[in-house]
């Protein structure tokens, strides 16, 4: 079996908003990597045994006395090191160079002129008309390196940054003041490939097929002939987890699908058809709509609704698990960003790996072992694996749907009537987005039920019914978002269909709020 962890890159995080993007780019190249906090110990680095190390950017200033520094062992480990932005600055400082606060800060696009050819910039050039090769890059820095460490050479400059890139080829140390991990840097992926593959010598074994083979083998080794229970929601993470487990242990996997009455139109039937009929998984469908809606009566505060939905799910799941007395393992669709977030929130350090209970926390008395086959993977990798396992692309690329479902898309108190109305309205919205070619042009779209009534006219009669809001946004990372400028004729068609086809809705509005100041979801 292919050892997909044999060659690996260690990324030390100094707090940049782009750090996870570095990891995703390295994985995209085909090499495994992990993201740890900057203050790891020598023992931890030795144990990980990286083939190369990348120092990320960060918001701090190396001119400050107590700013973060890379562990000294990083520069004594005998492996290549790439410093990006702050990572380059701390490399320079720690190896005897000097940094200063710049009079001319660089934020945004810049052109770096290459002054020397080294292994990092081999065959890179974005401007063939220039005397020296040039790269179109993305800068985001206020400090700059003003004096090189011994044995380093300047490899790149900009008009306001005399040392935009540097290298010591003998020790295989490299620094770039720009961000190769962002798509704005045109040859960024090629630069990272030069470092990871050509300089570090990593083999590109991190592929969907090899990841599946490795995951299946590890599941078999972990659980053996034991039985496993999984809460299957129909979302990407739990779906891919289910198929990996099914491939590894077959009928020893018991999937529990909880229909809470807060799902999209016909979603429960679609999940059963896909995983029960098509893939042959062992699925228990629990119709718990009444139980959820009863528990939610009188609750209108968003966080209280979320907590109630999470608690009822745990109770329902617990009831079903008690019926399966031979189950010894609980499977979860935890992915790598969950692991990073969980560790950081508990300790402030990304390298302390803790379990992330994405089902809201299970009772201690269940005493089940934990199986998390996706915990090393980013979301885009999970989708690629799902595709390789046979899941349809349209399912894997669906817009995000919140864990509480319609519980946070019905404003105020949740009632079955409201859920039914917003479900049907949203189905029309999605249908028209697909038909018009807009579904995959926007990052997320959904319908919100507004608990207000307004007067409308149908034929010769007046009606006094509910209102819904349509929401569509465009975003790269969901941290910020712009409202999508859908064509007026499309919005008009969607509105007319909803008002005419969904009895109980008399008004449709379109949300034109960006994030910030608004959030993407209303609750």
From Swiss-Prot:
Residues that bind ATP: 233-239
Domain GMPS ATP-PPase: 206-398
Pathway given in the UniProt record: Purine metabolism; GMP biosynthesis; GMP from XMP (L-Gln route): step 1/1
Domain of life of the organism encoding this protein: Bacteria
InterPro entries per the UniProt record, alphabetical: Class_I_gatase-like, GATASE, GMP_synth_C, GMP_synth_GATase, GMP_synthase, GMPS_ATP_PPase_dom, NAD/GMP_synthase, Rossmann-like_a/b/a_fold
Catalytic-site annotation from UniProt: 85, 179, 181
Pfam family, any one: GMP_synt_C
Keywords linked to the UniProt accession: ATP-binding, Glutamine amidotransferase, GMP biosynthesis, Ligase, Nucleotide-binding, Purine biosynthesis
Classification via HAMAP family: GMP_synthase
Subunit structure as annotated in this protein's UniProt entry: Homodimer.
Name this protein carries in UniProt: GMP synthase [glutamine-hydrolyzing]
Lineage: Bacteria, Pseudomonadati, Pseudomonadota, Gammaproteobacteria, Pasteurellales
Protein encoded by which gene: guaA
């Amino acid at each position: 079996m292919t050892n997909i962890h044999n060659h690996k890159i260690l990324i030390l995080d100094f707090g940049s908003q782009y750090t996870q993007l570095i990891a995703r780019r390295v994985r995209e190249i085909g090499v495994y990597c992990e993201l740890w906090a900057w203050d790891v110990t020598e023992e931890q680095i030795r144990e990980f045994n990286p083939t190369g190390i990348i120092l990320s950017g960060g918001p701090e200033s190396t001119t400050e006395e107590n700013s973060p520094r890379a562990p000294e062992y990083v520069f004594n480990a005998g492996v290549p090191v790439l410093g990006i932005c702050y990572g380059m600055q701390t490399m320079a400082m720690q190896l005897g160079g000097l940094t200063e606060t710049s009079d001319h800060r660089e934020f945004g696009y810049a052109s770096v002129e290459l002054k020397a050819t080294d292994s990092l910039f081999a065959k890179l050039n974005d401007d063939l008309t220039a005397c020296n090769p040039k790269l179109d890059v993305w800068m985001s820095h206020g400090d700059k390196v003003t004096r090189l460490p011994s044995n380093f050479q300047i490899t790149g400059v900009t008009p306001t940054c005399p040392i935009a890139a540097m290298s010591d080829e003998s020790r295989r140390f490299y620094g770039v003041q720009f961000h190769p991990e962002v798509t704005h840097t045109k040859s960024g992926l090629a630069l990272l490939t030069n470092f990871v593959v050509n300089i570090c010598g990593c083999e590109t074994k991190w592929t969907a097929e090899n990841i599946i083979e490795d995951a299946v083998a590890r599941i078999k080794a972990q659980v053996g002939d034991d039985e496993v229970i999984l809460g299957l929601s129909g979302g990407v993470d739990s779906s891919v987890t289910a198929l990996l487990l099914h491939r590894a242990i077959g009928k020893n996997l018991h999937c529990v699908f909880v229909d809470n009455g807060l799902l999209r139109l016909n979603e429960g039937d679609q999940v059963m058809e896909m995983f029960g009929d098509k893939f042959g998984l062992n699925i228990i469908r629990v119709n718990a709509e009444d139980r959820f809606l009863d528990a939610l009566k009188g609750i209108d505060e968003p966080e209280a609704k979320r907590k109630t939905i999470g608690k009822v799910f745990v109770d329902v799941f617990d009831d079903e698990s008690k019926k399966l007395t031979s189950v010894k393992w609980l499977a979860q669709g935890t992915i790598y960003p969950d692991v990073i977030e969980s560790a950081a929130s508990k300790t402030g350090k990304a390298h302390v790996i803790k379990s992330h209970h994405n089902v809201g926390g299970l009772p201690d008395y269940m005493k089940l072992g934990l199986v998390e086959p996706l915990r090393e993977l980013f979301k885009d990798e999970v989708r690629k694996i799902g595709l390789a396992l046979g899941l349809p692309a349209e399912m894997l690329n669906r817009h995000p749907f919140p864990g509480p479902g319609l519980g946070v898309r019905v404003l105020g108190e949740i009632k079955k009537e409201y859920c039914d109305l917003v479900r049907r309205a949203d189905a029309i919205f999605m249908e028209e987005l697909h038909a018009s070619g807009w579904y995959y042009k926007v990052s997320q779209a959904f319908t919100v039920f507004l608990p207000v009534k307004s007067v409308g006219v149908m034929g010769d009669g007046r009606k006094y019914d509910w209102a819904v809001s349509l929401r569509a946004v465009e975003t790269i990372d969901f941290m910020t978002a712009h409202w999508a400028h859908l064509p007026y004729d499309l919005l008009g068609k969607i509105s007319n269909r909803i008002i005419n086809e969904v009895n109980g809705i008399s008004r449709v509005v379109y949300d034109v709020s960006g994030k910030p100041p608004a959030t993407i979801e209303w609750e």
